[in-house]
Amino acid sequence: MNAKIRYGLSAAVLALIGAGASAPEILDQFLDEKEGNHTTAYRDGTGIWTICRGAILVDGKPVVPGMKLSKEKCDQVNAIERDKALAWVEKNIKVPLTDPQKAGIASFCPYNIGPGKCFPSTFYRRINAGDRRGACEAIRWWIKDGGRDCRIRSNNCYGQVSRRDQESALACWGIDR
């Protein structure tokens, strides 16, 4: 079974991991694939106005309908959001992590569900207790979007299920070796 099928990760992400890329490089590629990079404001799956790779604030101000940014400004916003997510992981996750693990946790916890939902989560308790497999299992439980069960394809959010599988694969990268 090839790695793409086994982990659901793109060839680009797997190549970065294989080349020993840093967490910011892996996270940038992963988020580009999952979030896209929109220079015009749009509503996310829960109706929140976002821009670039899902940012809800630009220069401290909320994203509003009709907001447009240059690609260069989105690159700047994306770098700030990426760095904040990775800094959150460094500060709050108490076990040693590899770069792929940092990227997976940064995508899941601070970037996607937010710290407010992460801190009380089973994932957070398990990872900091050293139960890596249990933590990675708990990532896969976060498959609702705006109250919709994303396992039901007609709810049009099945990408959330795939994303959680991929974040889980990254967060547990290498623990079976």
Swiss-Prot record:
It is an enzyme of class 3 (hydrolase). GO terms for biological process: cell wall macromolecule catabolic process; defense response to bacterium; killing of cells of another organism; peptidoglycan catabolic process. It catalyses: Hydrolysis of (1->4)-beta-linkages between N-acetylmuramic acid and N-acetyl-D-glucosamine residues in a peptidoglycan and between N-acetyl-D-glucosamine residues in chitodextrins. InterPro entries: Bacteriophage_GH24 (IPR051018), Endolysin_T4_type (IPR034690), Glyco_hydro_24 (IPR002196), Lysozyme-like_dom_sf (IPR023346), Lysozyme_dom_sf (IPR023347), SAR_endolysin-like (IPR043688). The keyword Ribonucleoprotein does not apply. The signal-anchor, which may also be an uncleaved signal sequence tethers the SAR-endolysin to the membrane until the latter is depolarized by the holin, resulting in the escape of SAR-endolysin from the membrane. Belongs to the glycosyl hydrolase 24 family. This is SAR-endolysin. The gene is R.
